Every structure is written in C-alpha cells, then in structure tokens.
UniProtKB/Swiss-Prot annotation:
This protein's record includes keyword Nuclease: no
Organism: Streptomyces coelicolor (strain ATCC BAA-471 / A3(2) / M145)
Family annotation (CDD domains): PheRS_beta_core, tRNA_bind_bactPheRS
Assigned GO CC terms: phenylalanine-tRNA ligase complex
This protein's name: Phenylalanine--tRNA ligase beta subunit
PROSITE patterns: B5, FDX_ACB, TRBD
Enzyme class, spelled out: ligase
Keywords from the UniProt entry: Aminoacyl-tRNA synthetase, ATP-binding, Cytoplasm, Ligase, Magnesium, Metal-binding, Nucleotide-binding, Protein biosynthesis, RNA-binding, tRNA-binding
Location of the tRNA-binding domain: 42-157
Keyword Metal-binding: yes
Gene name per UniProt: pheT
Top-level taxon of the source organism: Bacteria
Length: 840
C-alpha cells in the first residue's frame, strides 16, 4: 500500500517538521511494515510553470514531425515575452494549457534544462510530459494538457504536487484495514497521539423504496449491498489534476472520471466500488453463484468460463461482473474519448458498494488468475459498515466533479449481524507481555483502535467492524503490546526452575553425537520419509517387521509415502550422493527417530482449540502416535585412514562399523555383546549381531558389518561399503545414567600378548569372551591387534588372532608368575571353548 504523506496529512495534523522517515519510524514501532519512503521530486528544481500555446509552426525536412511553438508563460521568464520552444509531441494545439520547464531548471534524474539550438531553432525550455516529470503514466503518452481554467504562469510544481513523500507499506494478510488511507491514518493518529478526521463520517441517507432494484440470492457470499444512482454526468468532465496525481502516487493509472472516482474512494476508505453504465444494465441487479457453462468478458477484454463456486453480479441477461474481482465489459463506463470517436459517453451510472465473503473472492481470483485491487482488499477483510459511506462519498464527488445529479433512491440490503464481543481479563496483556500495564492503559489502547470497552476486572470489548482480525483475547493483548511498543518490552533471561535441564535421553543423544564426531564421522540429517521399494533393495525378508510402516495421509512425495523404520535408507542415499560428486572417502552418522506402527493403531481425535487439552486428551493423543524409538547408524566407504608419508593408510572395513557400535555403547555405559550374525542388507560372512543382556536374556539391538554386494549394486554404492545401526533407546535402558569415574591404580600394569590359532569360522568375539572369563578379575582390558590367515603356516581353514592382555591388581604389584598364571588360565579356557591353541 502506497501512502502519500500529503494525503495522510488531510486526516491527521502531523507536525510540519515531520518527514516521511519520521512517520515510517512511528508506524514500524506500531507494528506496520513500512518498507521504503519514496521522495518524489527530490531532485526537481524550477522554474516549472503553466504556459499557454500561442502559435505552432510545423518544421519540415526532418525524419520525424517537429514543431516550433511560442508559449505564453506570463512573468515566469522575467520578461513577459512568449517563450520559444521546439517540441516533437502532437497531442496539443494552439490555446492549450501545458507545463513548461524554463532554462535553469532541473528535472528528475538530474536532467538540466538550458537554451539550446536544435532542428535549426533555439529552444528556450521544454514542454513536458508526465514521464519527464516523474509522474508515471497518465494514459496519454504525450504532453500534459491542463484544464482550460488553469492560470498561466502558475507554479506547476505546486499545481501538480510533484514534491511529496510516499510510504510503501507491506500490509500483512490480517490487516486489510491498512489497505486504505483511512486505515493508515488511524494508525498514524494513534502512534502520534493525535485526533483522526475520519473521512467515513458522512451524512448518509437511509435506504428507501426508490433505489435501483437489487436481489441477493446468496446472502452468505454477499451480506451487504448498497446501490446509488447518479444521472446527468457531463461527457466533457475529466478527472481534476489533484485526483489524478493522488491516484498516480498510490500506483494507479487515471482512466476516466467515473472510474477514477471509484478508485479514489477505494484507496481513501478501503471499500472497493464499481460503477455500471445504467443504460447498459437491463433489469434487476442480482448476486448469485455462477451456473456451469456461463461466460463473461471482463474489463481486461478476456472471456472467462465461470465456475459454479464463482460469485457473480448479474442483470436480466446474465453475469455483468465477477463479484469483488472485476466488472464485465458489457456494462463498462464509456468516457469522453468514446464520445469523440462517435460513441455515446456514459451519463448515468449505478454505484455498487458491497461486502463479499473473503474466502469466495480469494478462490475466484486464484481460479481465474485475476488479482485486482478490489480482490486484494476483500481477501484481507473489508469494513462492512463502510459500504454506505463509500457510496455516498462517490456520489458526492461525481456530483461535484461531473455535474451529475444524485437520485433520491437508496438501495441497501444487509444480513442481520451482531457486533463481535470478547470478554478479557484486564490484566491479560500484563500476563502475556510480562509487563504491568494497568487497566487504564489497556482500556485506552483498545479504545484507540476503535473498540468499545466496558467493565472493571473483566472487560467486555466490542470489536470495531474494520478489525475482523481481532478474534480472541490474545489478539486484544497484542494490540495493547504493539501500541505500547515492542521495543519497550524488557529483555530478561529465562530462569528455569531448579533441577530442570536436559533429560537423560537428550544427554545420551548429545554424547553419542560428540563421540562419533570425535571418531571422524560427519553427521547427516535426512528426511524421515521412505518408499516401500527400499526394503526390497535392502534385501529384507517379506515378513521382516521393518516392512510394517506408518503411512502419511498427505506425503510430500508420492514416491516416499511412509515414515522410516530404519536410518540406513537415508544415510546410504546421502553416501551415494556424496560419492557421485567426488567425495569417495566417507564416514557418516545420524541419530534420529524411527517409526513403528502399534498393534492397535488409533486415530487421533480432533481437539477443541478454545481450551487447554486435559490429561486424558493428551494421553489419547500419545496413544494414537506410533512407537518412535531413537536409533543411531553409521555408514563408511573408501579410505578410513589416508595414505601418506606416514604410511600406506587403510580402507574402511567391517571392524570400523563394529567399533562405532562399541563407541556408542561406551557413551551409553552399557555392556554390548558382539557375535556373528546374518540380517538383511549385510554380507552374511561379515555381519556382526549386536546384543545386550536384560534380566539374563540376550536381546538383539542392532547389526554392524559390510553390506551385501547385491545391495551395493542395487543402490549404486561403492564397493565394500560398511554400515551399523543400533537401537539407542535400548542401550539407554540397560546403561547406567550415572557416570562412574574409573578407578586409578597406583600399581603398575602387566602386559601379556597371546596369539591363538582357531578355525577360520570362529568369531573373534567368542575368543575374546573366553579369554575375559578365563583371565578373571585381574584382567583390566583386552584388545585384538592382529589377524593372520596364512594357510602354509597355519593350515587350511585356520587363522591367528593376536590379543594384548593388560593385568593389574588393585592392592599390590603383580608378580610375573601371577600375570602368567592369569594368561595361561585365559588361554586354557579359550582352548576348551573354541579349540584355540597358542601359536608357536
């Protein structure tokens, strides 16, 4: 919404020293988004005067028609002599009043005017068009021709209001009242604490039986319709300069007097209007829904096929306008140009000022891709009480400017409606803002926006008709807070109650993320949506529980209509994208929720919004949610350690995936078991099953290892890609939430290395478990540091596993014999359990 400061001053007595920037700051403080302040005529300098064309000499011999004119500018040139000017325009004649810029002046854009020789003549100035003066398009595309009564020599800068400031306001969807000068003036008056001269306060005659007949068939779509008639409009009447300039400043193009007046009143009061040529309207004006197959040619010359939900204005022939959007060409106003071309100029008009349903107008405008100034206002909300005043204002201007006669008949049809009232505690704004405003301030601010307020501790507030956005107590609180100034709200740090903070689940989530990042993994956050074809790509069995998914009612993509049951699809897709873009050495991780439908999945009930949900309501909502455990997963490909002068490096392998699971388990302070496994996407010979022990029973919580070559090929992944996925919530349940500080012994450690030869199919985890149990309580740690599988030295189907054993006693220094005895016991049990023998 463009708001000229000069127009704003008509309704608010702003201090003379206030600039557009000052008003901008005030309105921004009050909550309006004033984006820019345009300075019209900022670099314009006179003399710029009204002149009268005395003579015109046609110059010949040039590529385009050129005229040499003498123009009377009065005493503006200091001599009183006619001014000689060369001009190429053709839309003026001898006797016309024009705008003349004299030597020494500067036009917008820094264009300086001086006497210069051109086309064999000396031109002492220039006859101006609207574009050259920065006025925009006036529809003539030529020289400005002023009304005959304009005084010669008058200052054209003042006459044409060329110097002004225009505020450009981005009006939000809830503030339709600010799509008018009246609405912005009201906000300005409040911001400055000044009275408002409301242009809608007019003496409006009441409805009677003599008005133009109107019938409303759809009172839901149109709850108010005012019709007024003006006859005897002069065919020669044109929009005065001040009206044209105001329309240009707000961004509209002058068209004809009747149309310009309706546009002017719309910009002034915010009420869209439409003028029909009375001679072209046949019978009763009606408001109804369109019928299938009906068509209308709108004012832009486009034939439109109507939809059954379109609200239309009709006469006895059919549609004559798209209600609230655009009028029809079959009742269009004909101006003086039509009369000059042999047609009949409109002399009698019917003025429509109506109130239409917001949703209906918005849908019609979008359906026909036809956004207009009228539809923009109806979509955001128009004051239904302004229709009669807007119609009266239009009638008054047409009578004043076009010499018309206002007929006595007044048609006004309105559906009964009660004003909207809200009961609000007087201290509610205080509670919302955390500031003690007091009852007097709350009442004063609400009255300033137009509310009627009664009551003491409990206020009964009647909302003004122009503010349909004020719907509940929080809207009223917002009005008080914004008018008191958002910048005056104190900045205070939140003070949570003692004992609050992150939950144990949140702390574990963060610890795991930090640990994996420290181990060289990069976090990747993926969408939680999957397509069911991904389970086939991962090689899951037909009866695998992971195939049971929660489907979305309105998915973002038809290809991914379900919520994930595993983190791997998203992580593997991220790895594939990165690998395809040249990043081949990858280690990614993600912690996030997966979703499993419950056995008895319920549908969440629609809760009312006028009260806080009860505990039962919240419990019912929780029961309708799917199970959402938190998982952690990693994927690896390429080099795990880079090659360089320090060594050969090494590729990522299944052991890295298993180690990432152990890293997660350490952060959860849980005992994680590892054994040979086989599941879905993993290579059957290189898959580890991860488990925890709960009440003496082992429970599988994840898998780790190298992915199956078939899965890699199907998904387009690099060779030897490895992955791990764990149920993090399951680890949390068996873990110790209280961190245990490790005991620090003052006694030295005794290290013993053993290399055991076992069958190739024996998992290292089983060997390690036997060594731990056999070594007893003196064993502090065990680490596998070498795997060797030379058939010539070890025999066919055999491998060597080398472990570093660390022994330490809490109360003494171990002797060599004690450490050796513990080692021998460990080796003996490993031999008994898995057939391990010491490598010689």
């Amino acid at each position: 919404m463009r708001v000229p400061l000069s127009w704003l001053r008509e309704y608010v007595d702003l201090p003379a020293t206030e600039t557009g920037r000052d008003v901008q700051a005030k309105l921004i403080s009050a909550g309006l988004e004033v984006e820019t302040v345009e300075h019209l005529g900022a670099d314009l300098k006179g003399p710029l005067v009204v002149g009268q064309v005395l003579t015109i000499e046609e110059l010949e011999g040039f590529k385009k028609p050129i005229r040499f004119c003498t123009v009377n500018v009065g005493q503006a040139n200091g001599t009183g002599e006619p001014q000689e000017i060369v001009c190429g325009a053709r839309n003026f004649a001898v006797g016309d009043k024009v705008v003349v810029v004299l030597p020494g002046a500067t036009l917008p854009g820094g264009f300086s005017i001086s006497a210069r020789k051109t086309y064999g003549k000396t031109s002492h100035g220039m006859i101006c068009s609207s574009d050259e003066l920065g006025m925009g398009d006036d529809g003539t595309h030529g020289i400005i021709v002023l009304p005959p009564e304009t005084e010669v020599g008058k200052d054209a800068i003042e006459l044409l209001e060329l110097v002004d400031e225009v505020l450009d306001i981005a009006v939000t969807a809830n503030r339709g009242d600010c799509l008018s000068i009246r609405g912005v003036a009201r906000e300005t008056a409040i911001a400055y604490g000044l009275p408002l001269r409301d242009p809608a306060l007019l003496d409006v005659p009441g409805p009677n039986a003599y008005g133009y007949p109107v019938k409303i068939a759809d009172p839901t779509g149109c709850d108010r319709f005012t019709a007024r008639t003006v006859t005897g409009l002069s065919a020669e009447a044109r929009s005065p300069i001040w009206l044209q300039r105001r329309l240009q400043k707000v961004g509209m193009r002058p068209i004809s007097l009747a149309v310009d007046v309706t546009n002017y009143v719309m910009m002034e009061l915010g009420q869209p209007l439409h003028a029909y040529d009375r001679s072209l309207v046949q019978g009763t004006i009606g408001v109804r829904r369109a019928q299938e197959g009906e068509k209308i040619v709108t004012l832009d010359g486009t034939e439109r096929k109507l939809h059954a939900e379109d609200l239309v204005i009709t006469d006895d022939r059919g549609p004559i306008g798209l209600a609230g959007v655009m009028g029809g060409a079959n009742t269009e106003i004909a101006d003086h140009d039509a009369a000059e071309n042999g047609g009949n100029a409109t002399s009698d008009v019917v003025i429509e000022a109506a109130h239409f349903d917001q949703v209906s107008i918005a849908r019609t405008a979008r359906r026909h891709k036809l956004s207009s100034e009228a539809s923009r206002r109806f979509e955001r909300g128009v004051d239904p009480q302004a229709a009669a005043a807007a119609a009266q204002r239009t009638v008054d201007l047409l009578v004043l400017l076009a010499g018309g006669t206002a007929e006595a008949g007044v048609t006004e049809i309105s559906a009964p409606s009660a004003p909207h009232t809200i009961s609000v505690p007087a201290d509610h704004p205080d509670k919302v803002a955390g500031v003690e405003y007091g009852r007097e301030t709350v009442v004063r601010r609400l009255q300033e926006v137009g509310c009627d307020v009664y009551g003491q501790d409990e206020l009964i507030v009647t909302v003004p008709s122009w503010r349909p956005d004020l719907d509940d107590i929080n809207d009223l609180a917002e009005e008080v807070i914004r008018l008191e100034g958002y910048e005056n709200l104190p900045s205070t740090l939140p003070r949570p109650p003692a004992g609050r903070g992150l939950t144990s689940r949140q702390r574990l989530h963060r610890r795991v993320g930090r640990a994996l990042a420290g181990a060289g993994y990069v976090e990747a956050l993926n969408y939680p949506f999957v397509g069911e074809q991904v389970f086939d790509q991962l090689g899951l069995d037909a009866d695998d529980p992971a195939r049971r998914v929660v489907r979305l009612v309105n998915p973002l993509s038809d290809e991914e209509p379900a919520l994930r049951t595993s983190l791997l699809p998203g992580l593997l897709a991220a790895l594939r994208r990165n690998d395809g873009r040249g990043a081949h050495d990858l280690a990614l991780f993600e912690t996030g929720l997966v979703f499993h439908p419950r056995d008895e999945q319920r549908v969440a009930a629609d809760l009312p919004v006028d009260r806080r949900p009860s505990e039962d309501d919240l419990a019912a909502l929780d029961a309708a949610l799917p199970d959402q455990p938190r998982h952690v997963a990693v994927v690896l490909a390429g080099a795990r350690e880079q090659a360089g002068w320090w060594g050969k490096g090494r590729p990522a392998d299944w052991a890295d995936a298993v180690e990432s699971a152990r890293t997660v388990a350490r952060e959860a302070r849980a005992e994680l078991g590892v054994r040979k496994g086989q599941y879905g996407p993993w290579h059957p010979g290189r898959c580890a099953e991860l488990f925890v022990t709960v009440d003496g029973e082992e429970r599988v919580v994840g898998h780790a290892g190298e992915l199956h070559p078939r899965v890699l090929k199907t998904l387009g992944l690099p060779a030897r890609t490895c992955a791990m996925e764990l149920d993090l919530d399951a680890l949390e349940r068996v873990g110790d939430d209280i961190p245990q500080a490790p005991g620090i012994s003052t006694f030295p450690v005794a290290t013993q290395d053993v290399a055991l030869v076992v069958d190739a199919f024996v998992p290292a985890s089983e060997v390690e478990a036997a060594l731990r149990e056999g070594a007893g309580e003196l064993l502090e740690s065990i680490r596998l540091f070498d795997v060797y599988d030379n058939a010539e030295q070890l025999g066919e189907g055999r491998k060597s596993l080398a472990y570093a054993l660390r022994f330490r006693a809490k109360d003494r220094t171990l002797t060599v014999d004690e450490a050796s005895a513990a080692r021998d016991a460990a080796v003996a049990l490993a031999g008994e359990r898995v057939g391990a023998v010491l490598r010689s």
